[in-house]
C-alpha cells in the first residue's frame, strides 16, 4: 500500500498515541460511507478464511445509541427478541459505554483506497453508574438509534477483522439518524442490509510498540484491500482512473474491446458444413474450457503494464 508522506506521518502519529492511551480504539473501515457491496463483502470473507485467519464465533447483537452518545449493547437473539417485545432495558444484561472521538487527528481518510482510519475513546460504564441509572429512569422517553448486527470475526496478528451485516434506524440525507423511541417505530427488520468491514488494532505482544502496532495495522488493512480489489498488487483509485481514461482515449470507446463469446450450436459442429456458418472442424483448435478472468493487456504512456477485465476493472 502506497501512502503519501503526509498520510504516512499522520498514521504514525495516530498509532503512537494509541499505544499510549489504553482507552482508545483504532480501526479502519472501507468503501464509500464505510459500506461495501455484498459481492466484495463475500470476497473478503473468503480471502480471510483461505489465508488461515482464526474465526471467532459471534452472537447477534443489538446496539442502542442515545443522543448523548451512550451506547447499550444486548448480545444474543433471545435477549434481543425480548427487548423488541417490551422495549425495556432494565433487568436485562447489557453492556454500556460512552464512545466518542479522541485525539487531535480522530479521522484519517485514505481517499485513494476508499479507507477511513478512526480513533475513538471507549469509556465502559457499570450498570450501577449514575449516568446509566439516569438514562434508564427515563428510558421510554429517550430518543434512540438501533443497529441490529450479524457479525463474522477473524483474528490475525495484532488485529481483528469484523465483517458485519447491519440493519439500522433510518438516516436522513445528511447521514444523521432519524431518532426513534421504540424498536418497532421503524421496520428495521425488513430494511435493506448494509455491509461493513472493519480492521481493529488490538493490544498485545504484537502491538506493544508503535512500530509493531503500525506494521500489524497496515498488514491487516492490506489484506482487506487485496480482497476488495481482487488482486495481490494494490493500486490507488487515482491510478485506476488514469489508466482507464488512457484506455478509452486509445480505443475511442468505453467498452471492452475483446471478441464477444458465441454460443455453439449443432450446426457449428456437423460434419456436413453449411456455407457461411462457422464450423469447428475447419480453422479452429478445440481445447478444454479454462476458467479464469478474461482481461486485456494495456501499456500506458509510461510503459507500465496493466490488465483490464470485461467490467473495466484495472489490475496492476
Regions found by a protein language model. Give the residues of each.
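Phosphate-end processing signature that detects enzymes handling 5′-triphosphorylated RNA
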Residues: 1-255
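Active-site-proximal "nucleotidyltransferase
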Residues: 214-316
Amino acid at each position: 500500500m502506497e501512502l503519501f508522506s503526509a498520510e504516512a506521518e499522520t498514521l504514525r502519529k495516530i498509532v503512537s498515541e494509541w499505544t499510549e492511551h489504553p482507552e482508545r480504539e483504532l480501526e479502519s473501515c472501507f468503501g464509500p460511507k464505510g459500506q461495501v457491496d455484498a459481492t466484495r463483502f463475500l470476497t473478503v470473507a473468503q480471502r480471510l478464511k483461505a489465508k488461515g485467519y482464526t474465526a471467532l464465533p459471534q452472537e447477534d447483537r443489538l446496539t442502542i445509541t442515545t443522543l448523548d452518545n451512550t451506547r447499550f449493547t444486548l448480545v444474543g437473539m433471545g435477549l434481543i427478541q425480548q427487548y423488541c417485545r417490551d422495549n425495556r432495558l432494565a433487568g436485562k444484561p447489557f453492556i454500556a459505554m460512552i464512545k466518542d472521538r479522541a485525539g487531535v487527528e480522530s479521522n484519517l481518510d485514505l481517499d485513494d483506497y476508499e479507507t477511513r482510519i478512526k480513533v475513538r475513546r471507549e469509556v465502559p460504564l457499570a450498570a450501577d453508574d449514575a449516568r446509566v441509572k439516569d438514562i434508564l429512569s427515563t428510558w421510554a422517553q429517550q430518543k434512540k438509534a438501533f443497529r441490529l448486527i450479524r457479525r463474522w470475526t477473524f483474528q490475525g496478528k495484532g488485529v481483528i477483522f469484523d465483517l458485519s451485516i447491519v440493519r439500522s434506524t433510518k438516516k436522513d440525507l445528511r447521514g444523521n439518524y432519524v431518532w426513534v423511541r421504540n424498536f418497532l417505530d421503524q421496520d428495521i427488520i425488513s430494511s435493506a442490509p448494509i455491509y461493513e468491514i472493519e480492521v481493529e488494532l488490538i493490544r498485545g505482544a504484537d502491538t506493544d510498540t508503535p512500530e509493531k502496532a503500525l506494521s500489524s495495522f497496515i498488514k491487516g488493512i492490506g489484506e482487506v484491500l487485496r480482497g476488495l480489489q481482487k488482486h495481490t498488487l494494490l493500486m490507488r483509485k487515482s491510478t485506476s482512473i488514469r489508466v482507464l481514461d488512457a484506455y478509452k482515449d486509445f480505443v475511442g470507446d468505453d467498452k471492452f474491446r475483446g471478441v464477444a463469446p458465441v454460443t455453439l450450436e449443432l450446426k457449428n459442429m456437423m460434419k456436413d458444413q453449411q456455407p457461411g456458418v462457422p464450423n469447428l472442424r475447419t480453422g479452429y483448435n478445440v481445447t478444454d474450457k479454462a476458467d479464469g478472468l478474461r482481461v486485456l493487456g494495456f501499456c500506458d504512456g509510461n510503459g507500465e503494464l496493466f490488465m483490464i477485465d470485461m467490467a473495466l476493472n484495472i489490475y496492476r
